[in-house]
């Protein structure tokens, strides 16, 4: 059942973002360090805020206009990673996330490949998510009891009718 923590929680975060461009290549890096302090009155009490200590997202991409500057092409790969932590689990009966302190998730890399193409007001995209799923074993979760998606492909068209 819901309750309010009887102690103060302190949350600290340092986030660094960097965007480097060399010619038509770009490297976009984001790294975040998080720390939480909670002095529990009872050692059996649940931690009320669970966050990974480190989170990183890095993208290497190539951008260029092709076909006489009529198509803008962008393609690249994205790397995501976070350290192990006690993630809240999703309870479908409550339609809410619930705090838990007994199963950790994290410490697995995730690679995605993408291609975006823009022609006037239309954007076409394709994304291959979790490229490395078959190489890293099948111990990756989005929350403690729900596995993260295996390799999947997303594609679509976005057509803006208004400016």
Predicted regions and their residues:
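Exposed, low-structure sequence patches enriched in small/polar residues
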Residues: 1-163
């Amino acid at each position: 059942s819901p309750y309010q923590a009887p102690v103060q929680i302190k949350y600290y975060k340092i986030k660094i973002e960097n965007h480097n461009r060399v010619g038509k290549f770009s490297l976009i890096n984001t790294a975040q360090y998080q720390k939480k302090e909670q002095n529990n009155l009872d050692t059996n009490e649940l931690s009320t805020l669970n966050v990974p200590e480190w989170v990183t997202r890095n993208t290497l991409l190539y951008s260029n206009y092709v076909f006489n500057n009529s198509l803008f092409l962008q393609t690249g790969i994205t790397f995501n990673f976070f350290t192990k932590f006690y993630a809240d689990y999703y309870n479908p009966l409550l339609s809410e996330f619930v705090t838990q302190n007994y199963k950790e998730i994290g410490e697995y890399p995730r690679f995605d490949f993408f291609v975006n193409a823009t022609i006037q007001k239309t954007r076409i995209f394709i994304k291959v998510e979790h490229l490395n799923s078959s190489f890293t074993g099948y111990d990756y979760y989005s929350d403690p009891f729900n596995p993260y998606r295996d390799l999947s492909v997303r594609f679509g068209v976005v057509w803006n009718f208004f400016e």
